[in-house]
């Protein structure tokens, strides 16, 4: 599993998650199964884990353990799945646990090492490969569809918002100019199309932002994250924990806002007395960052931030 993806902040995340070794938990970003394996190791025979992933490559890493239920689905469906499973499962004990809510939910956001390192997935500018970027390759638009079919205005918008790309308008113009001559079908063709916009001494950092923007658009990542957070809050039992590892400012801001206010955009909803009713409360006011030793052994951990929240009993008033 480590060859597929090295789990980030493994001990910190699982230690924060597990309060009851007999409890029921969800790992909604299964990937290589590293977090799930560690979670299972800390549960007793009565514990149970539900693991989600929409990528068929990840599902093939399933762990042979009767305490594990694998679900091939986007994590935004967690609440619907738990509600349905609570009514339909033949396992009476699991049904009772699900009816009471989950004890904890873990989400390790972003792209797995396997997805980055598999050239034909098209997630990385390090390889000249088809411009795909779909986490679920069985349907939906590809990154090639986005760069060839979106208007210049829409390209500029997603580059600016999802990638926080400097000079997004110029990049969008370069893309539309290149595709007018010939469709852009590979990562190499995209890199060539926008090379005039790349800063001389920070090409890779700039390209990473462009690719991030396209990937987020292709996979509806921000929309899925918002729906997941809402579903997670509804699915946790009072006192249950939500543990989220983020990798860029957009998703971290959304997670932070939701924990603080119960709204992805950070807008506070108050009652007539001026109290804010939020479903979660922060356990750590500041995010936990990876140790230097972990960053040295796994460079993809360097931008990670770990946030921990706990489900309130009846909503929080401030």
Give, region by region, the residue ranges found by the protein language model.
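S-adenosyl-L-methionine-dependent methyltransferase catalytic core, i.e., the SAM/SAH-binding region
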Residues: 1-318
């Amino acid at each position: 599993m480590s060859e597929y993806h090295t789990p980030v902040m493994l001990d910190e995340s699982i230690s924060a998650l597990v309060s009851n070794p007999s409890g029921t938990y969800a790992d909604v970003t299964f990937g290589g199964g590293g977090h799930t394996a560690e979670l299972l190791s800390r549960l007793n025979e009565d514990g149970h884990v539900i693991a989600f992933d929409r990528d068929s490559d990840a599902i093939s890493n399933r762990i042979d353990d009767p305490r594990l239920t694998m679900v091939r689905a986007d994590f935004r469906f967690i609440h619907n799945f738990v509600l349905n499973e609570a009514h339909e499962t033949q396992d009476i004990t699991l049904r009772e646990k699900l009816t009471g809510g989950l004890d904890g939910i873990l989400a390790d956001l972003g792209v797995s090492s396997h997805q980055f390192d598999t050239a034909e997935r098209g997630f990385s500018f390090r390889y000249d490969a088809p411009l795909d970027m779909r986490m679920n390759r069985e349907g939906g638009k590809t990154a090639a569809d986005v760069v060839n079919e979106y208007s210049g205005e829409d390209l500029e918008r997603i580059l600016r918002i999802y990638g926080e790309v400097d000079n997004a308008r110029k990049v969008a113009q370069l893309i539309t100019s290149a595709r007018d001559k010939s469709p852009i079908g590979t990562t190499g063709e995209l890199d060539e199309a926008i090379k005039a916009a790349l800063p001389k001494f920070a090409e890779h950092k700039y390209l990473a932002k462009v690719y991030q923007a396209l990937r987020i658009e292709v996979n509806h990542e921000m929309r899925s994250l918002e729906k997941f957070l809402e579903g997670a809050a509804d699915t946790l039992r009072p006192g249950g924990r939500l543990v989220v590892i983020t990798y860029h400012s957009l998703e971290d801001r959304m997670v932070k806002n939701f924990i603080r206010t119960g709204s992805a955009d950070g807008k506070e909803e108050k009652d007539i007395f001026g109290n804010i009713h939020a479903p979660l409360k922060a356990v750590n006011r500041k995010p936990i960052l990876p140790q230097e030793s972990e960053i040295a052994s796994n460079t993809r951990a360097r931008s990670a931030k770990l946030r921990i929240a706990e489900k309130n009993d009846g909503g929080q008033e401030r």
